Amino acid sequence: MSDRQVRGVLGTKLGMTQLWDADNRIVPVTVVKVEPNVVTQIRTTTVDGYEAVQLATTAIAQRKATKPAAGHFEKAGVAPRRHLVELRTTDAADYSLGQEVTAEAFATGATVDVVGTTKGKGFAGVMKRHGFHGVGASHGAHRNHRKPGSIGGCATPGRVFKGMRMAGRMGAARQTTQNLTVQAVDAEKGLLLITGAIPGPRGGLVLVKSASKARVKEA
């Protein structure tokens, strides 16, 4: 259960650029477009056992919403939305159904975590997927250069251990990048400029929220 106030918005990754900071240094930033999020549900300790606020974004046609979803949005008094997210926060009672949350939820200099789905790479070998060194290029290596090597002895252990790093589908997984800084906020255009790279492709959905492990600056 959350014991702190958490701010968050759903947005779309537009791409990367760079800008000058206050110390005249070039800083790479990712631009996130934040369409107004609306509050569609408020969870309380009395009813749900915890406090949280549910946000939704990207309006869709009424005919595209399932009956349960349409009823849910109708109860909140808003048009159906494509994406929803729930944030556990101690100040959920301060929100109201239908309230809009914009990029102004964050101020310049705020520390945030960004959650997104990484780019899918398809089926990848162990060198690309896990960074294996591979087998030698010479000294008798015969068509084994990119193979993983032994994954378990014949008699001992006589099996492959769970979690063995092997080839397989790479990417397209939920990932959180922590402790990024909001370099600038353009409230008029609904843009957040966040230091560094964030997960996902251009046009991908991301969740920007208050950092859970923000570094405390020593005096």
From Swiss-Prot:
Which SUPFAM superfamilies does the entry mention? Translation proteins
- Give a GO biological-process term: translation
For whether the record's keyword set contains RNA-binding, the answer is: yes
Highest rank taxon of the organism: Bacteria
Assigned GO CC terms? cytosolic large ribosomal subunit
- List the GO molecular function terms: rRNA binding; structural constituent of ribosome
Q: Which keywords, in A-to-Z order, does the entry hold?
A: Ribonucleoprotein, Ribosomal protein, RNA-binding, rRNA-binding
UniProt xrefs under Gene3D superfamilies = 3.30.160.810, Translation factors (2.40.30.10)
Chain segments carrying region Disordered: 136-156
Q: How does it assemble?
A: Part of the 50S ribosomal subunit. Forms a cluster with proteins L14 and L19.
Q: Which function does this protein serve?
A: One of the primary rRNA binding proteins, it binds directly near the 3'-end of the 23S rRNA, where it nucleates assembly of the 50S subunit.
Hey, which family's this protein in? Belongs to the universal ribosomal protein uL3 family.
Checking PANTHER family in the record gives: 50S RIBOSOMAL PROTEIN L3, LARGE RIBOSOMAL SUBUNIT PROTEIN UL3C
Name the chain's protein.
Large ribosomal subunit protein uL3
**Which organism does this sequence originate in?**
Kineococcus radiotolerans (strain ATCC BAA-149 / DSM 14245 / SRS30216)
The encoding gene: rplC
